[in-house]
Amino acid sequence: MEILMASSNLIKQLQERGLVAQVTDEEALAERLAQGPIALYCGFDPTADSLHLGHLVPLLCLKRFQQAGHKPVALVGGATGLIGDPSFKAAERKLNTEDTVQEWVDKIRKQVAPFLDFDCGDNSAIAANNYDWFGGMNVLTFLRDIGKHFSVNQMINKEAVKQRLNRDDQGISFTEFSYNLLQGYDFACLNKLHGVTLQIGGSDQWGNITSGIDLTRRLHQNQVFGLTVPLITKADGTKFGKTEGGAVWLDPKKTSPYKFYQFWINTADADVYRFLKFFTFMDIAEINALEEEDKNSGKAPRAQYVLAEQVTRLVHGEEGLVAAKRITESLFNGNLSDLSEADFEQLAQDGVPMIEMEKGADLMQALVDSELQPSRGQARKTIASNAVTINGEKQSDPEYFFQDSDILFGRYTLLRRGKKNYCLICWK
């Protein structure tokens, strides 16, 4: 069940969900929220052609504020993306070309759009790009109007920068050092243009956010606020949002809806109820009831399926969720008749291990090439023991050669050894 957060105690509700790492002048912010709707913003730098799971918590926070009646501004950093944020980064970022960054800006703007409502009256969301105010600014204006308000002493003492300065092998370029000024000016600019009074971001952005608060006060004599969401960690200490294949992306072309769904299904019991608070709009009482039910049911917990459904629907829509569940069910029961060509394309993208083979190959060779078996001899024994299926149908003849009828949609054959070991053959 989705809920609309009451604006008057919104900060408290976010804290109950574990979504507040730090907040400036919490009492004054709570008072301001109680007075009526505000405008707030969160920035997304185009450092890749897609957002990833690390962006999801602040993005959903924007949505939570909008549901409570506030006006969200999604800022895509067309200018800051050309510079690179040094915050807590061990080394200098590679600079991307203007054309590349512009292409990524367009993709990220489209990605952000479905999460917010851009047509709901007074609190309709706004999409902004900081290249609009930095693109035409000359260096003298930057140094005189922005630079003069920043103390280098304070800047080098910010934790995010200090870590780089203290390393013998990695310093920091003036380019990245100036990033703090750019993000600070974003806040001041959005305050003037749209009346923005709150910036939200990840906990690594605290130094940049407080710089923006100070600059807005100096330039416009306005009180503004900052709130950071926590860095998501897993109970076992490993990094959240990563798989063996790398980051989990929001773009379905980079991480398929099936793979995305499976990522959440595989959430550890120690993390799942916390993640339901972070990544869904379920009421806290409902999450607690689910935890109690799982604890007492004596069966496998239901929470992972609820989490996977909720987040996959949020990111990939009903169609993406239905496809992910259909593929999951088909792989589990071995019946592939319900799978569409698009479903096989998801599997080929990142769903199961995939190999390419020339037509006319035999089953033993396919098992070896796919690394489902180490040798033809072992493959022969496995096939004879009835442990291999082709598209869900058992095949016990070690001398079997693939037939045209084994090739689905003119391209695909799904092999399985045992219950869980899959490989998708893509025929050349």
UniProtKB/Swiss-Prot annotation:
Read off the InterPro entries from this record: aa-tRNA-synth_I_CS, aa-tRNA-synth_Ic, Rossmann-like_a/b/a_fold, S4_RNA-bd, S4_RNA-bd_sf, SYY-like_C, Tyr-tRNA-ligase, Tyr-tRNA-ligase_bac-type
User: What reaction is this protein's catalytic activity?
Assistant: tRNA(Tyr) + L-tyrosine + ATP = L-tyrosyl-tRNA(Tyr) + AMP + diphosphate + H(+)
Q: Where does ATP bind?
A: K242
Any idea which GO molecular function terms this record carries?
A: ATP binding; RNA binding; tyrosine-tRNA ligase activity
Q: Which residues bind L-tyrosine?
A: Y41, Y179, Q183
Q: What is its main location?
A: cytoplasm
Spell out the CDD domains in the cross-references: S4, TyrRS_core
Localisation per UniProt entry? Cytoplasm
This protein's UniProt keywords: Aminoacyl-tRNA synthetase, ATP-binding, Cytoplasm, Ligase, Nucleotide-binding, Protein biosynthesis, RNA-binding
Q: Does the keyword Protein biosynthesis apply?
A: yes
Cite a single GO BP annotation. Answer: tyrosyl-tRNA aminoacylation
| Alphabetized Pfam families for the sequence | SYY_C-terminal, tRNA-synt_1b
- Motif 'HIGH' region, which positions? 46-55
EC number assigned by the record: 6.1.1.1
Organism superkingdom: Bacteria
Renumbered ranges of motif 'KMSKS' region: 239-243
Share what the entry says about its subunit structure, partners included: Homodimer.
Entry similarity comment: Belongs to the class-I aminoacyl-tRNA synthetase family. TyrS type 1 subfamily.
Alphabetized HAMAP family for the sequence: Tyr_tRNA_synth_type1
- What function is annotated for this protein? Catalyzes the attachment of tyrosine to tRNA(Tyr) in a two-step reaction: tyrosine is first activated by ATP to form Tyr-AMP and then transferred to the acceptor end of tRNA(Tyr).
Q: What is this protein called?
A: Tyrosine--tRNA ligase
Q: Which organism does this record belong to?
A: Citrobacter koseri (strain ATCC BAA-895 / CDC 4225-83 / SGSC4696)
